[in-house]
């Protein structure tokens, strides 16, 4: 029976790590071309912005991505970007030499209802 102890300990640790990731919400994810397409589609379309989102930026690059499964999927893009003065400048930055800062862009997607919404754009901590 002592041979079961290491196996049971491994299972317990795996369960604990899995539970911890679920309880903490967001999970790190490798950025795919589909993720970049979703970011561009939502972030460049001002009508997809929640009315509480007042920041307007363009993004230079995605530094990392975290996702959270809710009643759809929430994407938290950690980006380098620049403030813009016009909705026409949203999306990828046309001016690659702008003065950049770090931002978090949260996008909510629910494919079965065709929902795509920018829920927040905040300076990164």
From Swiss-Prot:
Q: Which GO terms describe its cellular component?
A: extracellular region
Taxonomic superkingdom? Eukaryota
Signal sequence extent? 1-21
Q: Which residues are glycosylated?
A: 45
- UniProt KW GTP-binding keyword: no
Q: Motif Secondary area of contact in this chain: where?
A: 68-72
Q: Give the UniProt keywords, A-Z.
A: Glycoprotein, Protease inhibitor, Secreted, Signal, Thiol protease inhibitor, Virulence
Please state which protein family the record places this protein in: Belongs to the cystatin family.
- Function of the protein: Secreted effector that interacts with and inhibits host apoplastic pathogenesis-related papain-like cysteine proteases. Inhibition of host proteases by a pathogen extracellular protease inhibitor forms a specific type of defense-counterdefense mechanism between plants and microbial pathogens.
Q: What is this protein called?
A: Cystatin-like cysteine protease inhibitor EPIC2A
Provenance organism = Phytophthora infestans (strain T30-4)
């Amino acid at each position: 029976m002592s041979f079961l102890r290491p196996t049971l300990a491994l299972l317990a640790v795996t369960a604990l790590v899995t539970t911890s990731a679920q309880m903490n919400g967001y999970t790190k994810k490798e950025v795919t071309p589909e993720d970049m397409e979703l970011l561009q589609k939502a972030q460049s379309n001002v009508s997809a912005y929640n009315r509480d989102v007042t920041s307007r930026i363009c993004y230079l690059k995605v530094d990392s991505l975290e996702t959270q499964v809710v009643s759809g999927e929430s994407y938290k893009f950690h980006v380098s970007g620049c403030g813009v003065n016009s909705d026409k400048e949203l999306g990828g930055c046309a001016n690659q030499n702008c003065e950049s800062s770090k931002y978090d862009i949260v996008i909510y997607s629910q494919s079965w209802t065709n929902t795509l919404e920018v829920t927040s754009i905040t300076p990164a901590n």
